[in-house]
């Protein structure tokens, strides 16, 4: 399962939006945040982060089965992702410029819609993605058979199309490359300081 929403009733546009949103969120959760924690704390901190993030993905849903345990995983994940999500958003804005996407709109939508999500972090990168691609993401969706009313992210400057998935992937790759370079320099700097002590 890549997305948490119910997929049975999704049409091509719904599947595309879900995929693009997943790429946006995983730019932070799956790439930039682990690199950030690797840079500042080495492998131990990176694996701790990934453990918490995986627990949130598996049991962080608001349902009766995981309510007590999942709540703590979700809150800790929110705390650990607070800084990396914002770094990811700015790396994606730079990546949008390098990819030739709409970086000005990415900044505009980021500033306006970055809190249009129940999580304090998820819409950070989704807002940049929506703005960079000139599309509208999020909105109402079904989870575990129940309709969840959610605000939209971005403006529908143009309709969502399946080609937005490779565009989203391109933005992920460029943002990841930028992050890898920056965090490698930070990690080398920290290791250099440690050897001097």
Where are these regions (language model features)?
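Hydrophobic alpha-helical transmembrane segments
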Residues: 1-48, 52, 60-197
């Amino acid at each position: 399962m890549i997305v948490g929403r119910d997929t049975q009733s999704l049409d091509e546009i719904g599947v595309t939006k879900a995929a693009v949103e997943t790429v946006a969120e995983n730019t932070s959760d799956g790439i930039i945040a682990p690199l950030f924690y690797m840079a500042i704390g080495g492998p131990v901190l990176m694996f701790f982060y990934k453990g918490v993030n995986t627990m949130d993905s598996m049991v962080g849903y608001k349902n009766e089965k995981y309510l007590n345990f999942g709540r703590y995983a979700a809150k800790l994940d929110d705390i650990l992702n607070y800084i990396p999500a914002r770094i990811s958003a700015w790396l994606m804005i730079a990546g949008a410029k390098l990819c030739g996407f709409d970086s000005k709109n990415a900044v505009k939508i980021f500033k306006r819609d970055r809190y249009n999500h129940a999580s304090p972090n998820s819409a950070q990168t989704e807002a940049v993605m929506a703005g960079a691609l000139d599309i509208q993401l999020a909105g109402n969706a079904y989870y575990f058979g129940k309709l969840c009313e959610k605000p939209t992210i971005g403006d529908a400057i143009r309709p969502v199309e399946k080609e937005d998935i490779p565009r989203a992937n391109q933005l992920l790759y460029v943002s990841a490359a930028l992050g890898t370079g920056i965090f490698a320099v930070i990690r080398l700097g920290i290791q250099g300081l440690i050897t001097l002590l």
